[in-house]
């Protein structure tokens, strides 16, 4: 008998449809806005546990399932999340993330078109834990950490502007904070200056792609997550 909860048919099929890649070492998943990757103070079930239940049920595994979290996405963000299915794969992926050899791109629907259309942003950021918010400060000192990203304007819809972002550092709320600082808050992101919320409570920031060398097979892996259905016209 499984140590995990039993998923109903609808949930099982939904989870299966959102697996972008899987082998004996890794599972790459398309997260929706509102889902959490790892357990937090809300007590809501994280994807790491839901996917353990999924694998246990699909593979009829009676014992424990390993599902290691290699990186996180904020709750209101959608897109690619990579889990490790063995401790060896987790250790190697963690090292690759630390070394900067995992390349991720994000798509953001912004409330204004950036000018210039492409740039490298370098700022100093601090984090306010109580507010769960990051701020840009004038320079180094105290708790400030350097934050770097590259952005490129892609195209516009009737009201919003699609921007591709490559993160060069991994600071708290970095994309949200830096884009807001140049006058381009992300659609739905009230915390960083968007005028209105999204109906689903998420923000229009999407982890679009990931590129890395497989930690065991040593082959290059490139994956993309489809944009949410709510991104009409993008």
Task: Show where each model-derived region lies.
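RNA pseudouridine synthases
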Residues: 1-234
């Amino acid at each position: 008998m499984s140590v995990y909860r039993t998923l109903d048919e609808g949930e099982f099929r939904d989870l299966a449809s959102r697996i972008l890649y899987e082998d004996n070492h890794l599972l790459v998943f398309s997260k929706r806005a509102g889902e959490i990757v790892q357990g937090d103070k809300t007590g809501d079930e994280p994807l790491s546990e839901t996917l353990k239940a999924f694998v246990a049920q699909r593979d009829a595994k009676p014992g424990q399932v390993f599902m290691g979290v290699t990186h996180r996405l904020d709750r209101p963000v959608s897109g690619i999340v990579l889990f490790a299915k063995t401790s060896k794969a987790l250790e190697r992926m963690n090292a690759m993330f630390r070394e900067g050899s995992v390349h991720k791109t994000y798509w953001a629907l912004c409330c204004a078109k950036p000018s210039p259309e492409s740039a490298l942003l370098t700022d100093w950021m601090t984090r306010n834990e109580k507010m769960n918010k990051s701020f840009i400060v004038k320079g180094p000192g105290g708790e400030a950490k350097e934050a770097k990203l590259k952005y490129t304007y892609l195209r516009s819809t009737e009201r919003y502007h699609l921007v591709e972002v490559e993160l060069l550092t991994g600071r708290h709320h970095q994309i949200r904070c830096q884009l807001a600082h140049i006058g381009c808050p992300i659609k739905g992101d009230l915390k960083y200056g968007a005028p209105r919320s999204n109906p689903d409570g998420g923000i229009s920031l999407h982890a679009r792609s990931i590129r890395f060398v497989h930690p065991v097979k040593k082959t290059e892996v490139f994956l993309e997550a489809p944009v949410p259905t709510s991104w009409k016209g993008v």
